[in-house]
Structure formats: structure tokens, C-alpha cells
Amino acid sequence: MLVIHPKDKSTSLAETIYANMPNVHVVEDEWYKRGIGQLLWQTPKEEPILIIGYGDCRGLYRERFNDVLEISPSDLDNPVWVQRLANCQIGTPQIVLNRIHAYNLRRHNGNIIGIWPNAVEFARRNRLHGLFASTFFFNAKDAENYGEITLDMYIERSNYTLYRTLGKLLASHVPLCKIPEKLQQRAYNDTCVNHRNFESFFCL
């Protein structure tokens, strides 16, 4: 499995999905700078692709943007942090996966899992098939954007359950078309999870 998961503190818990899977190749940060088009082209058609992070209907961001950056004064001496701060002020996300990559993704015959906000709309626009999330909360601030008031602790605990469940389903080679129903069943059996995330998956 090829895993496209740009490093971000808000989404790091999602590593639980693939942490114990065999034959997982996680894309290194340098590919996001160079562009992942060549990597997608070199990936065998039969290999599944898992995509996780922040994004919208246009594609996947390299990192969360337009938010509070946790930096110390010493970080301002680092050109990388200065560039990140500038990007945050501009409010323009750096998209690392977009419609240009749709052709290479379509080669994988629907064996794609996309977990980011509006991933399902991105898939529909680009005629992709697989398992995609519609809305997804990585933390309480994400939920607030959709009018839901909650706590980070609650979202993280709920997502950990979701990630473990999804990871087991993928490792067991459960068909993607059956996963939305199984995630919903898992949510119905647990009153302590955020049902919206569990119910946000659609198979296209």
C-alpha cells in the first residue's frame, strides 16, 4: 500500500490506520516538494493508495493552513518556519495532489482510500473510484467549522477508535464497498464516538 500522508500534528494520530500493516510505503516529505506525479506513475496499478490529510474539493494540502502556528521566537531564525508563517498569512494552501494526478489515480481501479474534508467531491469531479470521506474532523476546531462544539480529547478518542477499526478492515481485505456500513455499525455500538466521522465515508 502506498500511503500519502503529509506530516501534520493534527493528523498524526491517523498513522494508527497503517502502523501495523505489512508492505506499506509511506511517501517521504521530499516527494511533496518535488511533486508526487512520478511516484504515482511508478506505483503498480494493483497497489492500493491511502491518502490522508487536510484538503478540499480541489485536492490534498501539504499541511494545514490559515490557522495558528505553534512556534517559538527561536523558530523565526529558521527559514522553513518563516516560509510557513508567510504562507499562513497569505492564506493560500499548497496543494500536493490535485486534478493533474487524477489520471494516475484512476489507473488503480478504484483501490483508493481518501480521508480529508471533501475528498468525496474531489473524487466525483475527477471520476475516481474507491472509499472517500465527505466531511472529516481531525480536531475540535475542524468540528467547530461545521457548527459542532466538542473537545479535542473527545475527537481524538473517537478517531483513534475509527482509525483502528478502519486499519483492521483494510488489513483483512474487506471490500471497500462494505466498509461504510461496517464503520456505521461500529459507531452504533459505541455511544462514545463521534458519529459524523464514522458516517462520512462513501464508496464511489
What is each of the regions a protein language model found here?
Residues 11-13, 58-63, 122-124, 140-142:
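Extracytoplasmic/secreted cell-surface and envelope-processing proteins
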Residues 18, 63-67, 127-129:
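Short, glycine/charged-enriched secondary-structure capping and boundary segments
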Residues 34-37, 57-59, 101, 120-124:
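Short, well-ordered alpha-helical microsegments
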Residues 1-52, 72, 76-80, 113-115, ...:
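A domain-level signal for caspase-like cysteine endopeptidase catalytic cores
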Residues 56-108:
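A short, glycine/acidic-enriched catalytic loop
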Residues 110-204:
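Active-site-proximal C-terminal subdomain of hydrolase catalytic domains
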Residues 5-7, 48-64, 132-137:
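Short loop/turn segments at strand-loop or loop-helix junctions that form parts
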